[in-house]
Amino acid sequence: MDIKRLELLRELSERGTVGAVADATGVTPSAVSQQLKVLEQEAGTPLTEPAGRGIALTVAGRALVQTATEIAIAVERAESRWHDFMKQPAGEVTLTTFPTGGEMLLPQVLARLVDVPGLRLVCTDQDPLLPDFADLTPDFDIVLADSPVNSPSWRDRGLLVVPLMSEPLDVALPESHRLAKKTKLTPKDLAGEIWIGAPADFPYDRILQEIEAVNGVPAIVAQRFMDNGIVESMVAGGQGIAILPRYTTRDRGNGLITRPLAGVRTRRDISALMRPDRAERPSVQLVVETLKQEAQKLAASHTQAAG
């Protein structure tokens, strides 16, 4: 039996006339009568009978009204429970990230979310050479992406872009380097240096391009590596200098130091990319909020350390 027709029968039992039911439900009296006739056919027995100038419910009709009431209660209860469930941050959330983004944020985020009932955060990392991390949003709930500036294509594609943090990028030098005594460097200081570079069009490589533009001469790039750990080892070993992210570069007691660079834009913006529909899920919202909080704490801790 159709729930909507059962509801019409309930309305008839409460309002007394087909006309009153029609007024309450916004349909014509003939439409109400037609639906009640269909319900009688489904029930296999008369549900109404003539009563004066109107109609009244039969014994079967009154019994079915009781059943309809029980069904309506069950539907309301189910909808209420579903509404409560949808407000809870439960279920699986998939996240993918570039390597250093995961290194900075994921251990702390996972630790904070481990005790949330019913929530499971599943994380993976991606090849940093991926042309556009936005291409991953159909396959993951949250995509962590880095860029010198937020790419216009992200919003052009209808994605929700949540800024998490802006990380400075520094010049990494061997401890014995001639520039090690300086507290801040300029592009002119770096003219003629040997570089350990990143793949073309990485955020680090774009800063090297800006240094080239300021100095008016090409940079001398001896090697290029995707992995920052290899770059750190090469710099510490005296093979050249490099652009590296401030928050994940290991520059304590390993033969490597970092210095800020003035005169060019030296930072990368880190954002969470999502399809708008997935961003509506409470579980996804909780993960993103936790990412934001951890990113803010990380940036604040480095600011305090620098101060």
Question: Can you describe what each PLM-predicted range is?
Answer:
Residues 40-57:
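A short LG(V/I)-centered, amphipathic sequence patch enriched
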Residues 12-28:
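Short helix-boundary/capping micro-motifs
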Residues 157-160, 229-277:
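Beta-alpha-beta core module
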Residues 42-43, 64-86:
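Alpha-helical linker/hinge and terminal dimerization helices associated
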Residues 92-151:
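Central regulatory/effector-binding core of bacterial HTH transcription factors
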Residues 259-303:
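A late-sequence structural motif
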Residues 155-169, 173-195:
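Flexible hinge/capping segments at coil-to-helix
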Residues 194-214:
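Secondary-structure junction motif
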